[in-house]
C-alpha cells in the first residue's frame, strides 16, 4: 500500500485557507533540499504565484489547446482567468461514488507538498461534472515522447541530464514522501524552455490508481518483469522503467524486441554490432500500437501485447548497441535493466555511477538543444549562457 502523509485538515480542496502559514513551512522544507540558487529562486517564485490562485473552480478556466491524451485522461493547456496563470489541466473522467471521489481529491492534496525542481508543480485538484481535474505547472517543451518524435533520437549527453533529473525526482518522492512513481516512461518526463526536466503523473493516490486500474493497459510495456508477474515490486521497478525509457530515447524506437544488425545499420547509418537476429523464428519487430519505423525495412506485423509482455518476462533485457554509445552509458542502462530487482542497481548506486558523475560535470545546453529541436523560442532570461 502507498504510504501517505496525513491529508491537511479542512476539506478546502486547494488548501488556500492555510496557504500563508504554509509558505514559511515550505521555505523551511526547501532549505532541507540540496538546491542551487537558481532552483531555490524558481521554486519560491512558483510558490508565491501559487498563493495568488485561491480556490480552483471550473468556471475560472479558459481552454487554450490540447496538450495530450493518455493515462485515462486528457490534458489541456488552460488559462486560469483570476490569476492570469497558464496551467496544464488534466481531466480524468470517472464514474465513481462521491465518497471515493472525495477520497481521491483528499489523497491528491499530498501533491501540494511535492516541491522539488524535478517534480512538476501542482496548483490543486477539484471535482466537477463527472471529472477530476488536476492542475499543474505548464511545461512548454512537452513530454519526452513528443520531443523524441521530433528529434528522431535523443543524444547521449542530453540523456545524461535526463537521467540525473529522473533519479533525483525518484529519490525525492521516495525519501520525502515515501512514494514510488509507478509509471516512469518518456511521456511522463516533461521539459521546458528553461532547461528543466520534471516527472509527472506519479502514483500519489492509491484510490485513484484503483479507480483507474482498467485504463492502465497501455502502460504495461514499461513495466518491470516482477511487476508484470504480479509479484511484490518496489522503487526498483521504477528503475527498470527508466532504463527501458533511456534505451528507447537513445535508439529512437521502443526497444522490444531488439533491433537486429540490419535495422541498427539503417538507424545509425553504419554497421553496428547488434544481436544476430535471435528472434528470426518469430517474424515480428514492433511493439503494439507502434508505427512502422521510418526506415522502411520493417514490414513485419507488430507484436501482440501478450507476446510483448511474455518477451519482457522471459527473454534477455534490452541493451544499447555497441559502438554507438559510451561504455559508461551502456553499463548504466545494463544496471537498470537487470531482471532480478534485488540485483538491479538502486537509486543510491545509480547516483554515484560513472555515467551520472560524468553527466553532472558536463556543460550541456539542454534548453538550447530542446528549443532548436522542437522549434521553441528560448526565454531571454539570464538563466542561459550568453551567445547560445
Curated annotation (Swiss-Prot):
CDD domains: PKc_MEK1. Its main location: cytoplasm. ATP binds at residues 67-75, 90. InterPro entries: Kinase-like_dom_sf, MAP_kinase_kinase, Prot_kinase_dom, Protein_kinase_ATP_BS, Ser/Thr_kinase_AS. It is found in: Cytoplasm, Cytoskeleton, Microtubule organizing center, Centrosome; Cytoplasm, Cytoskeleton, Microtubule organizing center, Spindle pole body; Cytoplasm; Nucleus. SUPFAM superfamilies: Protein kinase-like (PK-like). Transmembrane segments: none annotated. GO terms for molecular function: ATP binding; MAP kinase kinase activity; protein serine kinase activity; protein serine/threonine kinase activity; protein tyrosine kinase activity. Residues 1-20, 275-299 are annotated as: Disordered. Residues 61-356 form the Protein kinase domain. The active site is at residue 183. It catalyses: L-seryl-[protein] + ATP = O-phospho-L-seryl-[protein] + ADP + H(+); L-threonyl-[protein] + ATP = O-phospho-L-threonyl-[protein] + ADP + H(+); L-tyrosyl-[protein] + ATP = O-phospho-L-tyrosyl-[protein] + ADP + H(+). The modification Phosphoserine is found at residues 211, 215. MAPKK is itself dependent on Ser/Thr phosphorylation for activity catalyzed by MAP kinase kinase kinases (RAF or MEKK1). It is an enzyme of class 2 (transferase). The keyword Phosphoprotein applies. Keywords: ATP-binding, Cytoplasm, Cytoskeleton, Kinase, Nucleotide-binding, Nucleus, Phosphoprotein, Serine/threonine-protein kinase, Transferase, Tyrosine-protein kinase. PANTHER family: DUAL SPECIFICITY MITOGEN-ACTIVATED PROTEIN KINASE KINASE DSOR1-LIKE PROTEIN, MITOGEN-ACTIVATED PROTEIN KINASE KINASE 1. Dual specificity protein kinase which acts as an essential component of the MAP kinase signal transduction pathway. Binding of extracellular ligands such as growth factors, cytokines and hormones to their cell-surface receptors activates RAS and this initiates RAF1 activation. RAF1 then further activates the dual-specificity protein kinases MAP2K1/MEK1 and MAP2K2/MEK2. This is Dual specificity mitogen-activated protein kinase kinase 1. The gene is MAP2K1.
